[in-house]
Amino acid sequence: MAVTEAENPLLGEITCGTLLQKLQEIWDEVGESDEERDKLLLQIEEECLNVYKKKVELAAKSRAELLQTLSDATVELSNLTTALGEKSYIDIPDKTSGTIKEQLSAIAPALEQLWQQKEERVRAFSDVQSQIQKICEEIAGGLNNGPHVVDETDLSLKRLDDFQRKLQELQKEKSDRLQKVLEFVSTVHDLCAVLRLDFLSTVTEVHPSLDEANGVQTKSISNETLARLAKTVLTLKEDKMQRLKKLQELATQLTDLWNLMDTSDEERELFDHVTSNISASVHEVTASGALALDLIEQAEVEVDRLDQLKSSRMKEIAFKKQSELEEIYARAHIEIKPEVVRERIMSLIDAGNTEPTELLADMDSQIAKAKEEAFSRKEILDRVEKWMSACEEESWLEDYNRDQNRYSASRGAHLNLKRAEKARILVSKITAMVDTLIAKTRAWEEENSMSFEYDGVPLLAMLDEYTMLRQEREDEKRRLKEQKKQQEQPHTDQESAFGSKPSPARPVSAKKPVGTRVNGGGLNETPMRRLSMNSNQNGSKSKRDSLNKIASPSNIVANTKDDAASPVSRADPVMASP
């Protein structure tokens, strides 16, 4: 029973005293000696001391660790506040009294808060620095300098603001560079469109990221890319300038050849894309394909083709202009020698010593001068036409007056009667017409310092001959009238003495058609020659008839050419050989 209680000492309340009491009871039962008991008690005491000693050592060690932890926490707190630079924003206890654990408990919340801030600040620094490093690598051309390291000794907001300002500057620089790259790419695109070049291959040769399929933010903005883009743009602009210069030269040649060869508008429209830029500046040429090589080659082929046709076409155009010049002279009744002029034009073109443009320009100048001269002669020529028309009417009137049947009731007689009335009025103005024409002609000759010729004959000579013939006609009429009076005077006296006798029937002359002038003997004989021939053949009666039929101005023109002793010839409008 005692053994069982000894083996279960923990059944009751266990203390050192109860244990010692139990030990005494056991020794009493066993019969241990006092020496043995003292020895055992001493051993127990030593073992208790060792236990206490170990506990003290453990407690001391724990205290030291707590002190070290407190010290480390204090240092960490100091370092964090220094690194973050935000001591004023953290509730940090200043007192050093109280137990170690109390001090640790007081520091722990501030330390935890600073650790959180540090982690957030490190992430912010890491994010900013990574963006800065990325942009710097893009500007440097994609050089990777390795992962960035955040300096945790200085995590202050001031330093973070500095990094953020630097990031903003780099972002602005990146934006500016990207904008510049896009401008370069757009310029390259426009130039390639005008020159009809492959835009994609052109920009990808500079950098693969410049392909339009790639996003804007992925395009290279490095110094090398910008430099190569600038060089590409410069090369394309020089190419554009050279092509435009070549195209304008071809356009000028085409225009000259067209003007030279009088090319139709339909043929010219085929090369509007060439001539439309003949005076354009480089920046004004923006149409797609306007300076393509194939268009320039087409223009070159057309210029070569026109050059080959130029000689034959030149002769055709020159003769056409010569015909125009001859027509102007013909309308102005100016006599030239067209055969000689055409031969000289042919020889000049075949020799090739004269530029076609100069030749045609000279002919155009002659045409302009001919038109001016024709215009200056117009008033006189109009008066000449009126004079000739009046003379024709006078000739018709004389034929009409000699017609014995003019008052008959034949068909159209009333029309001839009206015409005769108008003709008499017109004939009465002929003298004034001639006088005015002479005055106008003399004034023209004084103004132009040259003789006024009509179909190669001086007009004043024609008018003088006409005036002379008209005066002879008037004199002849007066002479015949006086002669007739003298012949009729004896008959009048005889009739008054013995009475009148019926005269034999007057022979009826052959009926002549009225309205057509009859100049028996031909229109091309000179009045003086015709008068001379008629006088020799028919005597005074023929001479009288010739004077009554005054020569028309057209006959005077033809005959004055033959009879003029010193005709005034007009210089042929022939281009001077260079």
Swiss-Prot record:
Feature type site, description Microtubule binding: A409, A420
Biological process per Gene Ontology, one example term: microtubule cytoskeleton organization
Biased composition annotated in UniProt, kind: Basic and acidic residues: 473-494
Keywords: Cell cycle, Cell division, Coiled coil, Cytoplasm, Cytoskeleton, Microtubule, Mitosis, Nucleus, Phosphoprotein
GO terms under cellular component: cortical microtubule; cytosol; microtubule; mitotic spindle; mitotic spindle midzone; nucleus; phragmoplast; preprophase band
InterPro entries associated with the record: MAP65_Ase1_PRC1 (IPR007145)
Region (Disordered): 473-578
Record's subunit section: Forms a dimer. Binds to microtubules (MT). Bundles polymerized MT via the formation of 25-nm crossbridges with centrally located endocytic MT.
Family membership noted in the UniProt record: Belongs to the MAP65/ASE1 family.
Protein name in the entry: 65-kDa microtubule-associated protein 2
Species of provenance: Arabidopsis thaliana (Mouse-ear cress)
